[in-house]
Amino acid sequence: MTAFSLEPEQTAWCEELRTLAEERLRPLAEKGEPGRVNRPLLAALGELGLLDRMFGSGALELCLLRESLARGCTEAETALALQGLGTTPVVRAGTPAQRERWLPGVRAGRTVAAFALSEPGAGSDAGALSLAAEPTPGGWRLTGEKCWISNAPEADFATVFARTTPGAGSRGITAFLVPADRPGLTGQPLDMLSPHPIGTLEFDGVPVTADDVLGEPDRGFRVAMDTLNLFRPSVGAFAVGMARAALDATVAHTARRTAFGAPLSDLQAVSHQVAEMATRTEAARLLVFAAAAAYDAGESGVPRRAAMAKLYATESAQYVVDTAVQLHGARALRRGHLLEHLYREVRAPRIYEGASEVQRAIIAKELYATAAARQAEARQTPVQEPAADPRTQEPTV
């Protein structure tokens, strides 16, 4: 099992990223419109080389990148992560022609990607999706709807998962790369609690060909899961970044704000809550980084550890941000306050890329499977009799 600690160079890089996010990226984020793709912000991420670095990183470096950006500017973090989610399938499963077509624009921050998996009736149960890919002489026609899709409907292309074999469950899903200008493809933005762009995609006989297939036909579910398994710990890192931002603000506020003739930090009821916030944040951070390091090392038990990391980090971040709002009082409820923003932002990660309930199911399934395997192994291992004592010819106790 990986024992995790950061190298000094990694810690320094994280601080550089945080400063960069605060000074260079946050001003661009503040000029953007909530619920819309911020193309100037994406262009800046491309110019700074952060999008390119994301695609060349392992799970741990991705977590460091996302946490550091989230601590300084959640909009920048989200913009980067959504590009990664929509494009990682191309990086991992795309043909040379597909990579050449889409990756340069994404790396430069010019091309916007979307990851179109969820549907109105298939969120947590992704294997039950119903977007139909009906065979035609030249390929397929996509008919149906995707919902809760980040960057929709403004994305320039989407990685779309559709059912090519009815009744085959997760084994009958194919991944397609669908440009936004395909006939029959439309969409609508959704007005959501969280400020990043989310919308629907409607497919009315959208034509796709074999050149649009990502990976192999009927093997698209694996493409989706490979992407989500990489990104799941980093969702926890995003949550940790928000928790650290809320904790930083709370420590500063309670140290300078006076009540009853003394700083709030002198009140045990306050300081103990801050201590709890710090403890949960640090525990979540270590759990996330250890899961990511285990992924990079190819260790066993990664699905369980990744699920634990996402579950604990997102739930802890919700607690930390909520407590921070409480300790700041009414000022934190004003539109435009950092904590008002974090309060809206922190809720969604407990749902997307596998809700907390799904993570608990994964953890429990892995635990019971491991226990069953150990029991089966124990039953198959012959019991060895103790060696006889030559002096007594009796078994040694």
Regions found by a protein language model. Name each.
Residues 80, 121-124, 149-151, 167, ...:
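Short Gly/Pro-enriched turn/cap motifs at secondary-structure boundaries
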Residues 128, 180-207:
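Flexible, small-/acidic-enriched active-site or ligand-binding loops
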Residues 109-117:
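A short, Trp-centered hydrophobic/proline-enriched beta-strand micro-motif
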Residues 143-186:
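A short core secondary-structure module
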Residues 131-134:
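A structural signal for short hydrophobic beta-strand segments in well-ordered beta-sheet cores
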Residues 199-227:
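A short, charged helix-loop
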Residues 1-74, 105, 109, 139, ...:
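Alpha-helical interface subdomain recognition
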